[in-house]
Amino acid sequence: KLSQLDERFENLKKIQNVFLNCFYNEPKTNQLYKEITLNKKTDFSRYNYFYASYTNSSGKINEAKNIVQSALKLYPRNLLLNQYKIDLKEEKKINAFDCRKESHVIAEILYITANALSQESIYSLSNFYLNLAKYLNEDFHSFNTLMAENFYKIDNLEKAKKIYKSLGKRGEAYNWYSAKQTARILIQEKKKNKAIKLVRNTYNDLNNKNIYQTYDFAEFLKNNEKFDESINYYTQIINNVNKKHPLYSEVTDGRGIAYERIGKWSEAEKDLLASLKANPNQAYVINYLAYSWIEQGVKIKRSLEMLEKANQLRSNDPYIIDSLGWALFKLKRYKEAKGYLQMAVRLMPGDPIVNDHFGDVLWKNGNEVQARY
């Protein structure tokens, strides 16, 4: 019995309890769904979908919409919830999961097992359980997101692309997700232009764009060196959120990097500082700004203080360690710099910039012969 199992299975007991009560149509089902979705210790975001689906199937569509809307405030990127929001709005008669159907409940338990196996990198066995889950509930297309990711992890890219293509036909949110994942594969296959075209066209076709989709599109453009275009989308978001919005620090960081890459440093600096003002403990933003100052030969002492903080936040990150060592080098504290730059080389031996920095500090410390190699 589950009650006799280790404490680690407490969450599974909660899931079992909800599904058992729903299966037997017990009056407390609604309350149990509320309790599990309000749990702050564990990510039960998926169960907001099950709760909304249960409520909708009971004829309470407006209540189901409210459940989804409230959940999306906490989990704005949740794929299941985003797609179900669209389905409810369009009044699609879809009941991909019904906790009163034994096969659906068993399929979900098999999915939980598959997900756990995937997290342990046991991808083939994970897909075995996913296939069983899909057999028991062929309408629950969310299973395919994990299966495609498993195939991607074992480098079966064609199979992953095929699943994403099929998944993309199941709704607008699924289509956007599938386009991004397919683009990742296309870039890996050296088909960057095709990837950009796919994501751009899919984004433009979205009827229900939200700021998170716009942010993802801006990030995709920036990461693929479409800096000017990305700035336009970052700016759209900044104009529509306040400084306390969770995305604000990320958007100003992204736009700041894009500005820096096209040579507009004053705009970049302003955005990066705004990002840190909104969220001061972003190690990588601290590193990006401080390293940029160091490269320009300005604010070296301030950069050092910032990088020491970044190093405390991310003590084993080679990029931050390299930046910290380089700041010490610029301040002519060569012996201290050597220790950090040597550590950075050990963590990232193939990086040419890190190796150049280490070579420079070796030279300054009198290790001319070693520096040559």
Model-inferred region functions:
Residues 4, 38, 73, 134-135, ...:
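Conserved structural position within tetratricopeptide repeats
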Residues 6-7, 56-80, 86-89, 168-170, ...:
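TPR/TPR-like (Sel1-like) alpha-helical repeat modules
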Residues 6-16, 40-50, 61-63, 74-82, ...:
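Generic helix N-cap/helix-start motif at coil->alpha-helix transitions
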Residues 19, 53, 87, 115, ...:
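Residue-level recognition of tetratricopeptide repeat
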Residues 23-26, 58, 120, 154, ...:
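Structural motif corresponding to the intra-repeat A-B loop/turn of tetratricopeptide repeats
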Residues 25-27, 61, 123, 157, ...:
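TPR-repeat structural position
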